Amino acid sequence: MTTPTEFQFTDYQPYDFANRRHIGPSPAEMTDMLKVIGYNSLDGLIDATLPPSIRQKAPLVWGAPMTEREALDKLRETANKNKVLVSLIGQGYYGTITPPVIQRNILENPAWYTAYTPYQPEISQGRLEALLNYQTMICDLTGLDVANASLLDEATAAAEGMAIAERVAKSKAKAFFVDADCHPQTIALIRTRAEPLGWSVIVGNPVTDLDPVDVFGAIFQYPGTHGHVHDFTGLISRLHQTGAIAIVAADILALTLLKSPGEMGADIAVGSSQRFGVPVGYGGPHAAYMSVKDAIKRSMPGRLVGVSVDARGNRAYRLSLQTREQHIRREKATSNICTAQVLLAVMASMYAVFHGPKGIKAIAQQVHQKAVLMAKGLEKLGYKVEPETFFDTITVDVGHMQGLILRAAVAEGVNLRKVGETKIGMSLDERTRPATLEAVWRAFGGNFTIADFEPSYRLPKGLLRTSDYLTHPIFHMNRAESEMTRYIRRLSDRDLALDRSMIPLGSCTMKLNATAEMLPITWPEFSDIHPFVPADQALGYREMIDDLIEKLCAVTGYDAFSMQPNSGAQGEYAGLLTIRNYHIANGDGHRDVCLIPTSAHGTNPASAQMVGMKVVVVKVRENGDIDLDDFRAKAEQHAANLACCMITYPSTHGVFEETVKEICDLVHEHGGQVYLDGANMNAMVGLSRPGDIGSDVSHLNLHKTFCIPHGGGGPGMGPIGVKAHLAPYLPGHPETDGRPGAVSAAAFGSASILPISWSYCLMMGGEGLTQATKVAILNANYIAARLRGAYDVLYKSETGRVAHECIIDTRPLVDSSGVTVDDVAKRLIDCGFHAPTMSWPVAGTLMIEPTESETKAELDRFCEAILAIREEARAIEDGRMDKVNNPLKNAPHTVEDLVGEWDRPYSREQACFPPGAFRVDKYWSPVNRVDNVYGDRNLICTCPPVESYAEAAE
């Protein structure tokens, strides 16, 4: 017992975020782990892992790290510098109400936001069902056959639609028509996408300016950005007569009242599902949608959820038609799309489940009535309202009074849209209140109330919707919140996310997404800011973004950043466009060759072809390093036309290559630029800077290295950093600087999730970030050491070390026991783990990345599980287990297996409780192994009829 005279102050820091919360192993555990690897100190391990030539000279420093409370106070102080006005700017972004049951149980629930892309279907059945609901919702509303599981934003989806049109159109034309009534950011992105590919873009009035003979496709906005609602049936028919493709960019809320694009004959529909319960968030993240006719489904980009069966014949969901994606087809892929917007798509689908078709239609009717009331008030003041028929958006010509009225509206707390030099536009939404209408009328000089007018309709009668939508029973469930809460919980219980166990996916960096980092994204000062508000209303955002850019520059050694790309793949695309525009500005527009090693991520070659570059593949040596001789030969061979090379560092094999600076020098000697893929930046922060070792541009995956959660497959952020000579060629945006080259619908991409990365930097500090990198390397080397002897670690440095991930070789098991990498992955589910990355970058292997956030206990549990799997394979080799009927081949095992008739030559205990599995709180796979072949041969991408569920249960 301590007496007062013995009292001493402790030096323990309970609120040290970096060392007490974010980094998993304790100092004592690190010492034990280092002994297993064979080192006395963490710095000794780091010195042996990183080549001295790439180490940064000065430590990463930017002030003392903050506690969680201090960081939240700083975020609050910054957020309060934003002005939250009512924004009626529209232009694809609208006020919406997020049902609290969805906000609390999905957006704020780590079971949903910490999951990974559902490549392992057995442990992803919950979000796959939610995404199937989303696809069904989109197909119903747009009247088309197949929808994907979301894209990055509406403008990107429109550009992707154009690319599909060029690919599948029978027309040989090389021009694309864009309705001038499309949103300006959509037009800008289409121009960006078309120019490097040699396609011309014609912007005009489709009634007077469209000649179908001249184009391979056309896109129409429905309703238009200024409110016009046109019937495009005749124009679409004319396009089809010449073999061209018709795309309609449609507002899904309007589609509850208006004729669908499919009924007009459209081939493709695109748009945003932001109106379905997702805040505007200064531009994102939001889930864009795309739906297509059945005939062109294989050309559609992005994830596609389909229905299949499991080993018992029960219904199961999976990602379908994956062979068309970038990780398979590389430069021949339909798109470079990798990350989508799964979390936001889930929210939108749940909004439809929450309200049902009657509720959503009622919301649309109320929005329209508000717009009509607004128009009546302005007409009473003597203004001519355009158009005559509309859904939610109207425009008035106010002449020289434009500036005065806009300022008066701001004084009333309302943002209106500046249209040209004499007009003002306004878009009404779900959140518009009567007081808002009255405030706008006052800004126009009126002094009356909403009670002075009778509600009525001004929708075009010939376009009123008569077809049904959202007919599946899931959209007609009991709307009591208790039922909604339980439905969301049931789905999340089917999934395996970071809230249950580590997700050791190589090249994915599934680290902690701390609760303190997540809290600010729902604050209205961040979530309720329209992306096109006047600059003085977003000063907090700009302060945060500028400081984050300063920190990212310090981390990378670059001189400037663009925060516009809203995924890693978009970052690659933006970086390559920057290089291309730099060459053109210097009179080197002929430089179009991009050197890419065979080990590169599939997005690299896919991104290169999107900017019109020719991919030249470079060999990789047996040890995983780039073949320097082959690289040199190809750089010399293509010197006259060399635009750039794309490399990943550390390499995709998880090793710091010694020759990286030499590779960069070679490219520069031959007139090219170096693109260093930042996917593996978690092994470099604080230890090595891309800008110091010869790279000219990189993207950073903020959803990896800087703690934005993966959301089950999105959102993400992929900002690009560049050296000073490339800074003038970074993406512009029509709503900010007016420069060309926009790559995202909003100038700062998915800005509302940037507080996550900023607060991570504030709480870690430079020293904490550096320590996190060291521990990420420690954890990977610890796993490699623990698995030594059971599995070969394929790639190591000359000192025998790996970087932040390691690749273990499971190929020998195929010959010795018949056990495949799939079997190992599915058996890990029985142990309660998501499998590591399978068969990439080497087929038949597993790439393991534990990150710095996992404790020694969790690392040991994983090692015990995968070592036990090796012993099960050994039992097959020795004849102690059947080669076909064994726990590996039958994995994953379900509760149905446990309680059903048991006729297997191994026990229930062996099946369901292998080493590593929890006995209490065990994760049970909801389905047995999913049949991938069946799913692709019998493609169903919408909710099956309710009778089929009964059939599957029989």
From Swiss-Prot:
GO terms for biological process: glycine decarboxylation via glycine cleavage system. SUPFAM superfamilies: PLP-dependent transferases. It catalyses: N(6)-[(R)-lipoyl]-L-lysyl-[glycine-cleavage complex H protein] + glycine + H(+) = N(6)-[(R)-S(8)-aminomethyldihydrolipoyl]-L-lysyl-[glycine-cleavage complex H protein] + CO2. The keyword Oxidoreductase applies. Signal peptide: none annotated. The modification N6-(pyridoxal phosphate)lysine is found at K704. GO terms for molecular function: glycine binding; glycine dehydrogenase (decarboxylating) activity; pyridoxal phosphate binding. InterPro entries: GcvP (IPR003437), GDC-P_C (IPR049316), GDC-P_N (IPR049315), GDC_P (IPR020581), PyrdxlP-dep_Trfase (IPR015424), PyrdxlP-dep_Trfase_major (IPR015421), PyrdxlP-dep_Trfase_small (IPR015422). The keyword tRNA-binding does not apply. Its cofactor is pyridoxal 5'-phosphate. Gene3D superfamilies: Aspartate Aminotransferase, domain 1, Type I PLP-dependent aspartate aminotransferase-like (Major domain). One of its GO terms (cellular component) is glycine cleavage complex. Pfam families: GcvP2_C (PF21478), GDC-P (PF02347). Its EC number is 1.4.4.2. Keywords: Oxidoreductase, Pyridoxal phosphate. The glycine cleavage system catalyzes the degradation of glycine. The P protein binds the alpha-amino group of glycine through its pyridoxal phosphate cofactor; CO(2) is released and the remaining methylamine moiety is then transferred to the lipoamide cofactor of the H protein. Belongs to the GcvP family. NCBIfam families: gcvP (TIGR00461), PRK04366.1 (NF003346). This is Glycine dehydrogenase (decarboxylating). It comes from Rhizobium johnstonii (strain DSM 114642 / LMG 32736 / 3841) (Rhizobium leguminosarum bv. viciae).
